[in-house]
A protein has these predicted regions:
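Glycine-rich Rossmann-fold phosphate-binding loop(s) that bind the pyrophosphate
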Residues: 24-26, 48, 142
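N-terminal FAD cofactor-binding segment of flavoenzymes
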Residues: 53-115
Length: 378
């Protein structure tokens, strides 16, 4: 994404005003910016980091595909329509990385034991979501897909600023106007950018905007699901041929693959470029580290075989110092979260910022896009 440089106005220049400031240029923030800009709205799209960047929340569903197709038709976004199924995606955007997802596959693993092919009828499950490859769902390599959608938003007229976050914001309820100070990660205090916006959209994810004075604390105590994860992107993950049987309706690797353990489960999402997203999900009481991930894999022989040639390639920059180029797995102690409110005077949160439960069954993309649908039509 080619980010523009906004400067603070001089004494004789007016402060630049936008209809919408969208904080967060992930897929949901960028998709909303694309729609709004295509309808002639002035949109400022900011993000604290830069594209392309690592992210999870990578597996689509029939509901997500339906909503993408609906948005493409509803708002005349012909460039969006191919993302609604794997066949059209590969035909029109081979450079935007995805993976084939025919459905969901589940395999039970016992500690210290190989998966027994003779027990697969009772110890595995395949759930078909499409009848053929061409119409299948997709896994999204978010570094590629998010950048594509952000670029589409910019081409439609949105103004992008990267490596920048909101430093302070004040809402005038009488004018229905935000006065916002933006601070670049590369700037020192005193070089802030001043802008105004009618609406502030929170698409930042778990960070939220409470740090700038919006009273919207977390309210997660009631949630029954309390899980955390350790995850990353690997090359060299082997196919799970050990679990293939002739009567399978599709290959279990062409799916959101769930390896079910006694203590939790491991996801595997295979992209067409040889990268596989792998993550271990367990209750919040479990240990959370890269070493714990590998110990769990090694204690399940069939998983150890799958990962014997695997090499971690992302994320990069989590290890201190931040400039370190060595990849290290991301660790989240608790993924399940919820904010008190989804909206307030002059601001709205997209679902990605309001709350999240768990990656099980791949609900995240569809949930986020449903919020885009609602806001675009509001």
């Amino acid at each position: 994404m080619h980010a523009v440089e906004l400067s603070s106005p001089s004494v004789n220049q007016p402060i630049r005003r936008f209809d919408f400031l969208i904080a967060g240029s992930g897929f949901s923030g960028s998709l909303l910016a694309w729609i709004l800009a295509s309808q002639g709205r002035s949109v400022l799209l900011i993000d604290r980091s830069r594209h392309p960047r690592f992210a999870v929340g990578e597996s689509s569903t029939p509901t997500a595909d339906f909503l993408l197709a609906y948005l493409a038709e509803r708002w005349g976004l012909k460039q969006l329509a191919p993302l609604a199924c794997w066949g059209q995606w590969k035909k029109h955007y081979p450079h935007v990385v995805c993976g084939k997802k025919r459905g969901f596959s589940y395999y039970h693993h016992s500690h210290g034991r190989e998966v027994d092919p003779s027990s697969l009828e009772t110890q595995s499950l395949l759930v078909a979501a499409s009848s053929q490859d061409a119409w299948s769902d997709t896994h999204w390599l978010r570094s590629s897909v998010d950048e594509f959608l952000a670029n589409q938003a910019c081409s439609a007229g949105a103004t992008p600023i990267e490596s920048t976050q909101i430093h302070s914001a004040l809402f005038d309820p009488f004018e229905h106007r935000w006065s916002i100070s933006l601070r670049s990660a590369n700037e020192t205090p005193g070089a802030d950018i001043q802008v105004q916006a009618t609406w502030l959209i929170d698409a930042t994810g778990h960070q939220g905007l409470s740090s700038i004075g919006i009273d919207n604390p977390e309210d997660s105590h009631w949630m029954r699901t309390r899980t955390g994860a350790v995850y990353g992107h690997f090359v060299g993950v082997d196919p799970f041929t050990q679990a293939a049987i002739p009567q399978d309706p599709f290959c279990g690797d062409d799916a959101a693959q769930h390896h079910v353990l006694d203590t939790g489960w491991i996801w595997m999402l295979r992209f067409d470029n040889g990268v596989t997203s792998v993550g271990l999900v367990e209750p919040t009481s479990a240990a959370r580290s890269q070493d714990h991930f590998w110990k769990t894999v090694q204690s399940h022989p069939s998983l150890a075989r799958l990962m014997r040639n695997a090499k971690l390639v992302a994320p990069i920059g989590l290890k201190q110092p931040a400039t370190c180029s060595e990849p290290v797995m991301a660790c989240v102690d608790r993924m399940s979260r919820c904010r008190t409110r989804a909206w307030g005077p002059g601001w709205v949160s997209l679902p990605v910022s309001y709350g999240f439960i768990d990656p099980l069954h791949s609900t995240g993309i569809a949930h986020s896009i449903s919020g885009v649908v609602r806001l675009a039509e509001a």
